[in-house]
């Protein structure tokens, strides 16, 4: 599936709670005020090291969206979704951004160890083999 490239991060980051793979820099956090399927969630403008599944339409509390579920590229744990497109004009600001579930999928680290954080190129699967 590719080679792991460890990166030493000097700033705060969010990592997969299961395997500690780096997912997002704190600086890419847009908002804490979201709810995921499993509890509290955060909106990010960019994430790393994820597998994007097929796009599908979902009805959420703020309207209908085309989304791609995202999984950690290392352990394949479900961690959230990407907003591909909104049907509601008032929700278009979410397009292209990501929701990370905070309850079980990710946790915040102050000083990650170099071997704990990995950067992978984005991976997009056309079939949902992890659902």
Swiss-Prot record:
It comes from Schizosaccharomyces pombe (strain 972 / ATCC 24843). GO terms for cellular component: nucleus; ubiquitin ligase complex. This is Protein yippee-like PJ691.02. It comes from the Eukaryota. Belongs to the yippee family. Residues 12-109 form the Yippee domain. PROSITE patterns: YIPPEE. Zn(2+) binds at residues 16, 19, 72, 75.
């Amino acid at each position: 599936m590719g080679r792991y490239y460890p990166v030493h991060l000097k700033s705060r980051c969010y990592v997969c709670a299961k395997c500690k793979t780096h997912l997002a820099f704190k600086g890419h956090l847009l908002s804490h005020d979201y709810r995921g399927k499993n509890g509290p969630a955060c909106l990010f403008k960019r994430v790393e090291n994820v597998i994007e599944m097929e796009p599908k339409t979902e009805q959420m509390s703020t309207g209908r969206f085309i989304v791609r579920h995202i999984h950690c590229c290392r352990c394949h744990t479900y961690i959230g979704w990407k907003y591909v497109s909104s049907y509601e004009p008032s929700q278009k600001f979410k397009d292209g951004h990501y929701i990370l579930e905070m309850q079980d999928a990710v946790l915040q680290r102050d000083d990650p160890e170099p071997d704990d954080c990995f950067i992978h190129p984005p991976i997009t699967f056309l079939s949902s083999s992890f659902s």
